[in-house]
Amino acid sequence: EAVVVGWHRTFDFDRLDRASAAVRAGARFVATNMDATYPAPDGLLPGNGSLVAAVATAAGRQPEVAGKPEPPTVALVRARFGERGVVAGDRPSTDGALAEALGWPFALVVSSATLSGDEPSDHDAAFVGPSLAALADKVIGALVGS
C-alpha cells in the first residue's frame, strides 16, 4: 500500500484524513515534488509541497520525494537522455538543482514562480527568457556548438 501525493485542486479534509491514516498505518509515503507554490495566470497557488506538509504533519512522517532534483529523477533522466542536455524550467530550486546534479546547463523560463521572489537563486541559469520558444535558438545553438 502507498500514498502518493501529487498536486491537484480537489485535495480536501477527507483525502487528508485517509492519506494520513494510511501513512500512520505503515503505507509507503511518496511525494511527487515539494514545490511550495504552483504558478497560475493570476498568481501563485499552494503547491504540492503544501499538500505534502499537511499529510506529513497529520501522519507524523516525512515522505520519500520522487521528483526533481532527487537522485531517482537524476538517474532516470541520465538513463533516458545520456550525458548531454539542458534542463529548462521556472524554478531554480528544483529545475536549476536538477541541471546542477546532471552537470547540464539550466535554461530559466521566467514565470510568476520566479517573479514572486520566493525562489532561491542558488543555481545560476546559462539562459534566461520569457518562454521556452524565446530560449529555443539559444539552447539549440549551445547544444549543437558544444
Language-model regions, residue ranges each:
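Asp-based, Mg2+/Mn2+-dependent phosphohydrolase catalytic module
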Residues: E1-S146
